[in-house]
Amino acid sequence: MSVEEKISKIIMDQLGVSAEEVKPEASFVEDLGADSLDLTELIMAMEEEFGIEIDDDDAQKILKVQDAIAYIKNKQ
C-alpha cells in the first residue's frame, strides 16, 4: 500500500468520509469537516502508522491531504 493509500485510509477511518472526498487538495477542516480533535487524532494515527513523530509546529502546517502526503514522504 502506498503512502497516499495509507493516508487516505486513515482519513476515511478517522473522519468517516468517502474515498471520493479524499482528494489531494481537500482541506481537512473546510472540505472534510474535521475539528481540532479530529486533526489531533489524524496526526496521532499517522504517527502510529508510519512510525514517526510529528512535532506540534509541523502538525499545524498540515492543513490539506497533500500536506500530509508530502510531510510523510519527506520523513521516510
Swiss-Prot record:
Organism of derivation: Nitratidesulfovibrio vulgaris (strain DSM 19637 / Miyazaki F)
Pathway of action: Lipid metabolism; fatty acid biosynthesis
Short name of one Pfam family: PP-binding
Residues modified to O-(pantetheine 4'-phosphoryl)serine: 36
Modifications after synthesis and translation: 4'-phosphopantetheine is transferred from CoA to a specific serine of apo-ACP by AcpS. This modification is essential for activity because fatty acids are bound in thioester linkage to the sulfhydryl of the prosthetic group.
Record-stated family: Belongs to the acyl carrier protein (ACP) family.
Subcellular location: Cytoplasm
GO biological process, one term: lipid A biosynthetic process
Function: Carrier of the growing fatty acid chain in fatty acid biosynthesis.
Highest taxon of the lineage: Bacteria
Gene Ontology CC: cytosol; membrane
Any GO MF annotation of the entry: acyl binding
UniProt-listed PROSITE patterns: CARRIER, PHOSPHOPANTETHEINE
The entry's keywords: Cytoplasm, Fatty acid biosynthesis, Fatty acid metabolism, Lipid biosynthesis, Lipid metabolism, Phosphopantetheine, Phosphoprotein
Domain Carrier, chain residue ranges per copy: 1-76
Protein's name according to its UniProt entry: Acyl carrier protein
Main localization (coarse): cytoplasm
InterPro entries registered for this protein in UniProt: ACP, ACP-like_sf, PP-bd_ACP, Ppantetheine_attach_site
